[in-house]
Structure formats: C-alpha cells, structure tokens
UniProtKB/Swiss-Prot annotation:
This is Shikimate kinase. GO terms for biological process: amino acid biosynthetic process; aromatic amino acid family biosynthetic process; chorismate biosynthetic process. PANTHER family: HOMOSERINE/4-DIPHOSPHOCYTIDYL-2-C-METHYL-D-ERYTHRITOL KINASE, SHIKIMATE KINASE. Belongs to the GHMP kinase family. Archaeal shikimate kinase subfamily. It comes from Thermococcus kodakarensis (strain ATCC BAA-918 / JCM 12380 / KOD1). It is an enzyme of class 2 (transferase).
Amino acid sequence: MRASASSAVTVVNAFATGVGSAIGIDLWTRAEVKLKGDGIEGEIRVRGEQVRDFRLVKAVADVFREKTGEEFGIKFRIESEIPIAMGLKSSSAAANALSKALADALGLDMSEMEVVKAGVEAAKRAGVTLTGAFDDACASYFGSLWVTDNLGMRVLHSSKVEPLPVVLLLPGKTLLTESLGGRDFSPIRPYVEEAVRLALEGEWRKAALINGLVYSTYLGHPIEPFRIALERGAVVGLSGKGPAVFAVTNEPEELAEEWEQFGKVLTTELR
C-alpha cells in the first residue's frame, strides 16, 4: 500500500508551552509498505540520498502490532523531498505516510485522526520528537493551519490557508530534535504564550514572527535572514527548532536570491 504526507512550517514551537502551531507546505514524503512474515527491511531515500536510520519505521510497526495484536513483518520504501534535521517536519511526514500505508495494508478501519495519532505515538517512541509534535503531524497530514495542545493531544484551532508562495532557507548545519532534550525553555515561555494567543485568533503571520525571533535568539540561530525578509514585506519565521527559516512572500524569486548567501534555498507553497 502507498501513502503520502507533506512537510510543514512552524507558526509556534511547542517546546516552551506544550501548545504548538504549524501550516502544511507542498513538499512530500511517500511511503510504500508490504506485509511479510517477520522482520523489517527496506530503504529510505531523502532527496536522492540513502538514510539508514530505521528507528521510526520500527516504532510504527510496533504501534500497529500492539493495536492489532498481530505479529507481522514489513517491507518498505520511503522517498522524501523533505530535508532532514532542519525543522521541516520530516519525521512527522514519514510517520504519517508509514502509518497510513500500514493501516491500509492491514485493512484497518481507522479515521484519519486515528492514523495521525498512531504516527505521533511512533515518533515519541522513536525519540524524534520532544513534545509529540501533534501540530506538525496534523499540518503534515491534512494541510492548513493547526493549533494543538501537544501534551493533551487536543486540537485547539484549525483553518484553511491560501496556497501562498514560500521560500525556505536551509543553512549548512543541521540540528537533531533529540539533542535539545533537557533544555530549559521556561525563560522564553511568556513571549511564546503571546504567539500562541495570536495563533488561536488566526493571526498566524504575527505569531510566526514572534515565535521565530524568540526561538532563534534563544537557540543561537542568526537573525539576519529575518531582517532581509522583513524589509521585503514577507512573513518570516523559524521552522521547528531550526535551522530552517521560511518566508511567505509575493516575491519568492527576489528573496530566494538574497537568501542564497546564507545557505541552500527552496521554493514551494502553503497547502
């Protein structure tokens, strides 16, 4: 069985408050799953490069073994356009696509939200999320804007967004989510709470900027790309824990050209 899920960008990072917000974007991960007697085998390719970390695949299989009470093996293939360790929800997209493909292969009658929650559980077990990333998972699976209580696994707000152009800046370094375990985010909580309030009111542009500047400063990411984007009238934010920065702009080509001095640049759109 085949399934797909998309990347997303952050409106509010949940590290400080447990409440997160994200919007889907048009970069995709596709998974193919076949059942077999036992064991797990397959391959993962991200933007043409082979990845050998199968932790998430094993965790998804374990979640569904427990859900069904059955023992089974899987043969899988994952192809992804989403850069990893950049804050662009590559893990959420993979968990969603794998969970949907495996649920279909097993013939399970699951709602879409049940599939999403199974993927979140697998991501927690695999250690690729600190908060559960329920917001990222919803934005990845469904598209649109989502605000969620990640600790309580509750949807607080959801609304459609226009398919506006998005520019992604991918600096040379990467940052694994698990490397931030134990980091104290309480000093920035009051500022992130303001971003949450704005996101709940649908003011995602303002929320993304506040969140991005606060987390970028706290985590030591450069903010010069923010200044350049703001000068061009773009909506700009930090995606996840970074280092990826995104901008929603009506001048994607011009901003992309200016951002190339900081790293690799991709263009896509909201979904």
